[in-house]
Amino acid sequence: MSNTILQHLPIGQKVGIAFSGGLDTSAALLWMRQKGAVPYAYTANLGQPDEEDYNAIPRKAMEYGAEKARLIDCRNQLAHEGIAAIQCGAFHISTGGVTYFNTTPLGRAVTGTMLVSAMKEDDVNIWGDGSTFKGNDIERFYRYGLLTNPSLRIYKPWLDNQFIDELGGRQEMSEFLIANGFDYKMSVEKAYSTDSNMLGATHEAKDLEYLNSGIRIVKPIMGVAFWRDDVTVKAEEVTVGFEDGVPVTLNGQSFSSAVELFLEANRIGGRHGLGMSDQIENRIIEAKSRGIYEAPGMALLHIAYERLVTAIHNEDTIEQYRINGLRLGRLLYQGRWFDPQALMLRETAQRWVARAVTGEVTLELRRGNDYSILNTVSPNMTYHPERLSMEKVENAPFDPSDRIGQLTMRNLDITDTRDKLGIYTHTGLLTVGKDSMLPQLDKK
């Protein structure tokens, strides 16, 4: 049995808890204090769009018995990692061309490292959070926590049978808080659960576990319900500017920080419901789950970035960018964003792809993921329409005789290909004739 994971409350020891202020972590913190642990509460400010007062959360933790409560501002680091993911195309999950932008994995990478770093400052070497044993987060936090503090031990109340026996459900936790003098009112149960940060929101579980229930039951927190006929969405033009792979302007406006740029990108994209998607994905443990996602700012920046990538880079570079992006997206999803194999892929894309991406892209946003690209401008473009113009041009880069020569050279590999197909036919791997897929390859 692992010595890293504690299955019973460590009495008399400091225990750090990732504290959200919700029912679960509030009850857990009070319970740990009453049972003899010394709880320290750490709250990550990730720019959650559904959080109204971050400063109230540490105060609440102190009321529930925290020895110390700290609010850790993680927004700058989250914005930095979000831009890195866009630069690398680190997104491996998509359906019908609509992308999930790995916003929860990005949030976990930042939370897992920054909260554990804060705990080290307070000499807290035991960490607990609210992730369950069936999900991805339990492994992501485990990896990031131990990367940051190799002496870290893990205690999760939700893996402690005593906690589960005493406070196994939301009703029991609510009654526990009320019995201890806290006027806690359970929030109205939604048909799904929501987790969010500045980059995006995840809606999953409960009714959304059933595939006959979909986006129409979701109330967006970062944008509009674009699928509803009573929601008015007006078309809007927006221009996104990049310098050396970094988004720097929206409609010509510069921003004091990447955080402010993301917030404005969220507002613009959110007015249209841009970046919402419904995905079936494979969790780390290879079981499938379903989520409905929002990421209006990430989607806006990603579309503009990829337009510039295709205008600037050659085909082989774009191919490597896409292949490596799929691999890197999966590593990010698995909680390996800071592993050597991920850093290698990140460095490749950020150095050799992103650094050349300078320019502006103008889009018209409509409803949901419906948009058009109106203009693309870059000093680094290798797109030159005169090279392939259907009109007669002066000083053309090549003429018909050049193309005849190029096509003649193709005879070499065409002949080789025909010979190989003949070998496959002779061995029975292929058949030729009227009803075959290669009816014209018989010897004539």
From Swiss-Prot:
It is found in: Cytoplasm. Its main location: cytoplasm. InterPro entries: Arg_succ_synth_type2_subfam, Arginosuc_syn_C, Arginosuc_syn_N, Arginosuc_synth, Arginosuc_synth_CS, Arginosuc_synth_type_1_subfam, AS_cat/multimer_dom_body, AS_multimer_C_tail. Keywords: Amino-acid biosynthesis, Arginine biosynthesis, ATP-binding, Cytoplasm, Ligase, Nucleotide-binding. It catalyses: L-citrulline + L-aspartate + ATP = 2-(N(omega)-L-arginino)succinate + AMP + diphosphate + H(+). L-citrulline binds at residues 100, 136, 140, 193, 202, 204, 281. L-aspartate binds at residues 132, 136-137. The keyword Translocase does not apply. GO terms for cellular component: cytoplasm. ATP binds at residues 18-26, 44, 130, 132, 137, 195. The keyword Transferase does not apply. One of its GO terms (molecular function) is protein homodimerization activity. Pathway: Amino-acid biosynthesis; L-arginine biosynthesis; L-arginine from L-ornithine and carbamoyl phosphate: step 2/3. GO terms for biological process: argininosuccinate metabolic process; L-arginine biosynthetic process; urea cycle. Its EC number is 6.3.4.5. It holds the Pfam family Arginosuc_syn_C. NCBIfam families: argG, PRK05370.1. Belongs to the argininosuccinate synthase family. Type 2 subfamily. Homotetramer. This is Argininosuccinate synthase. The gene is argG.
